[in-house]
Amino acid sequence: MLDGFPLLTTKKMPFRLIATELLWFLRGDTNIKYLVDNDCHIWDGDAFKNYLNTYKGNFEMDKDEFVEAIKTNPEFAKKWGSLGPVYGRQWRNWETDDTDAPRYEHWKKDIDQISNLIRDLKTNPDSRRLMVNAWNVGELDQMTLPPCHYGFQVYTRELSLEERKVIAKKVLPILNTFLGNQSEEGWIEQCEKLNIPTRAISLMWNQRSVDTFLGLPFNIASYGLLLEIIAKAVNMIPDELI
């Protein structure tokens, strides 16, 4: 990531669709209406397949009619646009038992893994528990499609002063002219004034299955973008995508 963004250049890559899907995940959304409204049709086929397998009425729509109904009919979208507890649900609202519930009562609570990740990066960046998981074995049978890329982990490290100097010069190139022979203390002071990050962050994700030609380039770009977003949120520099 330090050398550039990992977007494949040997075939057409619709970056807008990649970003739209990632934002859909981060919203905690599991209904394709948001995607359809933003002209992103990555998940249309999965929702339509679920409709065909479930619908018991007299009139069965074709796929184009189905997508149009999702876009224009809120009640239809609410009923048929859901994919079950897929990525967004697990990332932002993983359901679990509430251990603070009164005795003999069964309460549920949601765990926001993304918020927890951001919090832990700010408070304990050297932790080896900086993970997000979408493989909820208790809900796999409710998902239209179980997660292919099912989890990711982030790692951070301290940046050396030399690395921070390189970043500072990119932020404000004129510094190289005026501070080229500056002392170490002077450079540290300038880096602090410019709010140059002190740490770099890397991300590693896991997949159980992938369409190498079609899906993998999307996954690489999506997790690259996610790393950029997380790094921005915690004032770190994107380092390695693994």
Language-model regions, residue ranges each:
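Terminal, non-catalytic protein-protein interaction segments that mediate quaternary/complex assembly
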Residues: M1-I242
